[in-house]
């Protein structure tokens, strides 16, 4: 049907007859000569329909409109002097059309394909049209390249690609499961996997040693810009390994994929403990493209003549007082901006935001009256203040302070426009707490199959796990852990999580049984493929890197899913639908 893709036609083909096919990107009539920009998968090629050359082709070209599907045959010639287009691979040549066929016509487009301001709901409803754009094609070409590079890298490292079940048992791992009713077993349900976690551990028990999968995962959770109800992860597991072995494989894989996709990245990543990340940056996924690190000043504030601050400082295990130095901040920010910063952190639960300004004649600000000269000097020294700097203080319960000061750090960086573009800063965050306590309930910070460093403890929140996350530019790219491979340890962890023996057997009995049959030490990691491509392309939403994504309400506007099903289907599944209560 065609002899060449548009992008392949160049000066070497001048004088040759070629056939190309694609969609009309634009049509222009210049004094009876019709110019058509024909676009196929990744390039535009100019067609010239001149009645002096071929009257039949010109007559057909008069009918052509945007997005018509054409097949064109003709001779390649050089463009006239001054008419070349350096932005196109085909910009030095054009086709004089001898034969033109309209393979299909198109209705007028519901939106301008390259208009970035078009309502997103319209674009998602007609997603197949948006996929015709060069931007979309380049995105999925990069995604394909990353996927191929992943398989090649892991194959070279001796990993075996194995597919695990999509219909499985409901074992909630933090988010809600998507449930699938069984027709054969009425009243019973499968669940779509939130991850292949348990199956990949069972593969290690089965002796597969090194496994990987580019896996579809499903989580019924509230959506954000970097979340979708169904997503893809690069899933990896290996036996007879320690944390260093896993990290070595992960760094090799990640760097190989980025380099194969044309990016310059390091092959070894920096590391930081979870505790250091929270204390310095207020986040377990800090963006290391810029500095703005916090320091602890709770001991200095304990001596201040302010009952609120000194009271907070008297409980250093529970509370924090953090200082965040902004170089030249006193010169950059107005008093109005300073007040605006306080309003910003209040949105996240802060009672306020203190600040000092480093002037030529010393430290100034509304809080200086509460400190002795020695303590003011201690603040200057601790924070490394220089003339022109500003320093901001957050005080209160530690998790609250970490949260709002961490958000404030990002807000400052965005306000000052100091975040470099086209830079990739990877970071391993290590030594995560095994558990966290919320409302008196113990939860696993990662998942309950993570190996704890020890189960000897006075405070359950002090137990550390052998877990690690890889962070890229402030986004959690993925993470993993060494797994529990002994039944008694797994049972003890379930017990600490408040999971009874009966519940453990009901939900995880198959895993506990497998651990009785010589399970090897094992560990692994998973990387979010969608997030990786989102960062590579600079996309603002994960929806831009998924071919047919869902909305913020987990709907597919293209197919109108989810949708009602007929009563006969429900009857076969032994399901009766109860009308949902109206939402406020």
From Swiss-Prot:
Keywords: Aminoacyl-tRNA synthetase, ATP-binding, Cytoplasm, Ligase, Nucleotide-binding, Protein biosynthesis. GO terms for biological process: aspartyl-tRNA aminoacylation. Residues 197-200 are annotated as: Aspartate. L-aspartate binds at residues 173, 219, 446, 483. CDD domains: AspRS_core, EcAspRS_like_N. It is found in: Cytoplasm. InterPro entries: Aa-tRNA-synt_II, aa-tRNA-synth_II, aa-tRNA-synth_II/BPL/LPL, Asp-tRNA-ligase_1, Asp-tRNA-ligase_1_N, Asp/Asn-tRNA-synth_IIb, AspRS_core, GAD-like_sf. ATP binds at residues 219-221, 228, 476, 528-531. It catalyses: tRNA(Asx) + L-aspartate + ATP = L-aspartyl-tRNA(Asx) + AMP + diphosphate. Its main location: cytoplasm. GO terms for molecular function: aspartate-tRNA ligase activity; aspartate-tRNA(Asn) ligase activity; ATP binding; nucleic acid binding. SUPFAM superfamilies: Class II aaRS and biotin synthetases, GAD domain-like, Nucleic acid-binding proteins. Disulfide bonds: none annotated. Gene3D superfamilies: Bira Bifunctional Protein, Domain 2, GAD-like domain, Nucleic acid-binding proteins. Its EC number is 6.1.1.23. One of its GO terms (cellular component) is cytoplasm. The record marks 30, 82 as: Important for tRNA non-discrimination. Belongs to the class-II aminoacyl-tRNA synthetase family. Type 1 subfamily. Aspartyl-tRNA synthetase with relaxed tRNA specificity since it is able to aspartylate not only its cognate tRNA(Asp) but also tRNA(Asn). Reaction proceeds in two steps: L-aspartate is first activated by ATP to form Asp-AMP and then transferred to the acceptor end of tRNA(Asp/Asn). Homodimer. This is Aspartate--tRNA(Asp/Asn) ligase. The lineage of its organism: Bacteria, Pseudomonadati, Campylobacterota, Epsilonproteobacteria, Campylobacterales.
């Amino acid at each position: 049907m065609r002899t060449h893709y548009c992008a392949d036609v160049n000066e070497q083909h001048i004088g040759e007859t070629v056939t190309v096919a694609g969609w009309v990107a634009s049509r222009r009539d210049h004094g009876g000569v019709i110019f058509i920009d024909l676009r196929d998968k990744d390039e535009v090629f100019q067609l010239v329909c001149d009645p002096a050359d071929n009257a039949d082709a010109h007559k057909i070209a008069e009918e052509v409109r945007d997005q018509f599907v054409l097949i064109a045959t003709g001779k390649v010639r050089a463009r006239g002097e001054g008419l070349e287009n350096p932005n196109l691979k085909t910009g030095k040549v054009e086709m004089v059309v001898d034969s033109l066929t309209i393979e299909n016509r198109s209705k007028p487009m519901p939106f301008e394909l390259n208009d970035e301001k078009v309502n997103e709901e319209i674009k998602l409803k007609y997603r197949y049209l948006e996929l015709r754009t060069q931007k979309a094609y380049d995105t999925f070409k990069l995604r394909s390249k990353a996927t191929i590079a992943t398989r090649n890298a892991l194959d070279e490292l001796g990993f075996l690609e194995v597919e695990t079940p999509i219909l499985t048992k409901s074992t909630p791992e933090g988010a809600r499961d998507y449930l699938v009713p069984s027709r054969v077993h009425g009243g019973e349900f499968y669940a779509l996997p939130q991850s292949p976690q348990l199956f990949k551990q069972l593969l290690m028990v089965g002796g597969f040693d090194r496994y990987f999968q580019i896996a579809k995962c499903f989580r019924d959770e509230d959506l954000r810009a970097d979340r979708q109800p169904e997503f893809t992860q690069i899933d990896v597991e290996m036996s007879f390994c320690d944390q260093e072995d896993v990290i070595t494989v992960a760094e090799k894989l990640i760097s190989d994929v980025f380099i194969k996709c044309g990016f310059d990245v390091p092959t070894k990543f920096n590391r930081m403990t979870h505790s250091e990340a929270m204390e310095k940056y207020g986040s377990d996924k800090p963006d290391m493209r810029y500095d703005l690190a916090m320091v602890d000043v709770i001991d200095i504030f304990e001596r201040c003549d302010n009952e609120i601050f000194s009271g907070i400082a008297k409980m250093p295990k529970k509370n924090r007082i953090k200082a965040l130095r902004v170089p030249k901040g006193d010169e950059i920010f107005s008093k109005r901006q300073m007040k605006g910063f306080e309003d910003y952190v209040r949105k996240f639960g802060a009672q306020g935001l203190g600040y000092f300004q480093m002037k030529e004649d010393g430290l100034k600000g509304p809080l200086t009256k509460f400190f002795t000269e020695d303590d003011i000097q201690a603040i200057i020294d601790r924070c490394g203040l220089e003339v022109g700097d500003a320093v901001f203080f957050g005080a209160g319960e530690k998790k609250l302070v970490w949260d709002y000061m961490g958000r404030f750090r990002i807000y400052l960086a965005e306000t000052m426009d100091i975040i470099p573009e086209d830079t990739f800063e990877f970071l391993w965050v290590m030594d995560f707490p095994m558990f966290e306590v919320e409302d008196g309930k113990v939860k696993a910070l990662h998942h309950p199959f993570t190996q704890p460093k020890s189960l000897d403890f006075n405070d359950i929140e002090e137990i550390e796990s052998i877990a690690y996350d890889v962070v890229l530019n402030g986004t959690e790219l993925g993470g993993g852990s060494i797994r529990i491979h002994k039944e008694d340890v797994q049972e003890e962890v379930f017990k600490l999580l408040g999971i009874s023996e009966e519940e453990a057997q009901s939900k995880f009995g198959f895993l506990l049984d497998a651990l009785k049959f010589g399970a090897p030490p094992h560990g692994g990691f998973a990387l979010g493929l969608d997030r990786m491509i989102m960062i590579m392309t600079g996309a603002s939403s994960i929806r831009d890197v998924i071919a047919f994504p869902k909305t913020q309400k987990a709907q597919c506007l293209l197919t109108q899913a989810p949708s009602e099903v007929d009563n006969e289907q429900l009857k076969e599944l032994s399901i009766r639908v109860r009308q949902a209560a109206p939402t406020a």
